[in-house]
């Protein structure tokens, strides 16, 4: 057993998990439960009253957090200590949304001035493009942005841009390319005019395979459509640490934006990686996005554990994963603009906490990161909600909804909200056999069939959920929401004593993929690998099954 699972608090939580009353009973015996188990911060309200939790549960979870030195670990992250120990890096995505008055030291120097300088450079660039001052090679203004990246440099900008669609500049469109599948970029290029298209290439090394391949294809398309190599600088910019490679490609050094080692890819949308967002919504709104995240940073850093929104959410998720064997967690967004958030939170959580050894290399003997999945309401109610209500697996849920819609048409939003709240109520209370049978009382069915149908209509309830509300989806509330989930992820990793900021699981597949690519291009069939890999490679080489 690890020190964590040997601890008296862990053992107490394990025993306590078997004795928590059904949520029906918890609500029936405490009319003030919502008031006691809800919290507002940074423009968000968290209702966590529909959880399998009592005051004793929360006390034990907060004790577990304290005994795991959570507060010290939070301070260490914000102070720029090397908490990504396997890569020997600080973790300072929070510095990207700091104020100009702050001082944050990394590697012996204050990084805030460089962050502010980059924001100011972004401001000038955005102004140049959106005003029409930036011209393409034929003198036309830019109408289309193509953002080329992978992982965090793709998903963050795409999902945030999608979420903030009401704030877009109507003169610009943005297209996101990540997958190395040629179909992805080909379908995008079919829509574009090379004279009015600007490509943003985002890669720390300027050598990420998928991103470089797509960028080279974009340049070939641009040149084939009439552009010259000398025109590349008017249509390509880069976010990278490798200035030399970018300038060799043809990008003007003045149009290269920096990346830093102390920012991980899945936390990078707040940096110049967010340039596509800034172009679409403007720098004032981009700064509001940063401000919302900064407010959540301040809350996370300073609120006591018992009143700390990311801490509470992280602890409750850990509670179900480690003591109720919950293997997945569903995120349900009751706002069409937020439909991409489950995929973003999936990457954030699963790449961060999909680990199986502690910081000192000990194998864990407890579950770590769950599968994160989800979708938008009300679509999911006609699909996977059936599993949530009557399936055998316990799947905690987060419901996210703005109280006000950007598109208040008729009763649409009233119906959306009623479905959201109704789902959380149904998950909590369920339906007993007697209730189901009573609903069939006036049916003409025979008594035996009523009994049978009633059994099929039983829902156990006691299915946990959080509800997150905001007045309206704005850049600020979106920033706070994303930062909330970042810090929630950190809380779990800190208690599990794992490194939430590396991703070695990504590397092996990449390395083997490069080896396979060489074998695909060889002059002879492959016979050097395992039988399955040999067969698959050779089938691909011959182009048919």
From Swiss-Prot:
It comes from the Bacteria. Gene3D superfamilies: 1.10.1390.10, Glucose-6-phosphate isomerase like protein, domain 1 (3.40.50.10490). Coiled coil: none annotated. Catalyzes the reversible isomerization of glucose-6-phosphate to fructose-6-phosphate. Pathway: Carbohydrate biosynthesis; gluconeogenesis; Carbohydrate degradation; glycolysis; D-glyceraldehyde 3-phosphate and glycerone phosphate from D-glucose: step 2/4. InterPro entries: G6P_Isomerase, G6P_Isomerase_C, Phosphoglucose_isomerase_CS, SIS_dom_sf, SIS_PGI_1, SIS_PGI_2. Its EC number is 5.3.1.9. Keywords: Cytoplasm, Gluconeogenesis, Glycolysis, Isomerase. PROSITE patterns: P_GLUCOSE_ISOMERASE_1, P_GLUCOSE_ISOMERASE_2, P_GLUCOSE_ISOMERASE_3. The active site is at 351 (proton donor), 382, 510. The keyword Lyase does not apply. It is found in: Cytoplasm. NCBIfam families: PRK00179.1. GO terms for biological process: gluconeogenesis; glucose 6-phosphate metabolic process; glycolytic process. One of its GO terms (cellular component) is cytosol. It is an enzyme of class 5 (isomerase). GO terms for molecular function: carbohydrate derivative binding; glucose-6-phosphate isomerase activity; monosaccharide binding. It comes from Shewanella baltica (strain OS195). Its main location: cytoplasm. This is Glucose-6-phosphate isomerase.
